[in-house]
Structures are given as structure tokens and as C-alpha cells.
């Protein structure tokens, strides 16, 4: 499972600065953080609707994950740092983690 995400992260990184006419990812990255954030919000809204209607949930979830990864790349946030943060939280209650912030 994580191998697929790792490949996607690498692909997104490799598209930065490429021809925007041949790659949707390159196009999104060229538009900057605000555009990527707006697209992510749009995709989250579509996922919300899909969950409520019990239709296309898997497809919309994949869209949200893709757009989240593109947004993180646009913002210069290293995905490995997020994985490390999640590993630190393993075995810790969500309530406990939130209290310790």
C-alpha cells in the first residue's frame, strides 16, 4: 500500500517544472499554493457528497489523496516528514496526542 503512495509522491516531485500542457500535475504545481489548496477543498467537498450519497467514494478519496500530495509538494512539505510524525504517534491515543500539542 505505501509503495503506491511513494511512487505517486515521486511522480509528483518529478513533474514540478515540466511542461504544463502535457501534465496536469505540472499544471497544478505551476499555479501555486492557493490554487492547489482551492482544488483540494473542492475535492474534499466532492468526497463529502460521495460519502453522503454512498456513491463514488473510492474514486473521490483517491482524488483527495492525490490533490493533498500535490498541495504538500507545492507548499514544500516533505511527505517523509509526515510519515515520521505519524510513526511518532503510533500507540498514542488521539486525545493524548492532542493534549500534548
Can you name each region flagged by the protein language model?
Residues 1-61, 65-101:
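Flexible "arm" and connector segments at domain edges
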Amino acid at each position: 500500500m505505501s509503495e503506491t503512495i511513494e511512487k505517486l509522491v515521486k511522480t509528483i516531485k518529478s513533474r514540478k517544472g515540466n511542461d504544463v500542457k502535457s501534465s496536469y500535475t505540472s499544471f497544478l504545481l505551476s499555479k501555486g499554493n492557493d490554487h492547489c489548496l482551492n482544488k483540494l477543498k473542492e475535492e474534499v467537498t466532492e468526497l463529502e457528497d460521495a460519502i453522503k450519497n454512498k456513491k463514488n467514494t473510492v474514486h473521490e478519496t483517491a482524488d483527495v489523496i492525490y490533490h493533498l500530495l500535490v498541495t504538500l509538494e507545492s507548499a514544500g512539505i516533505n511527505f517523509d516528514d509526515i510519515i515520521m510524525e505519524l510513526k511518532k504517534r503510533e500507540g498514542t491515543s488521539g486525545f493524548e496526542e492532542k493534549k500534548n500539542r
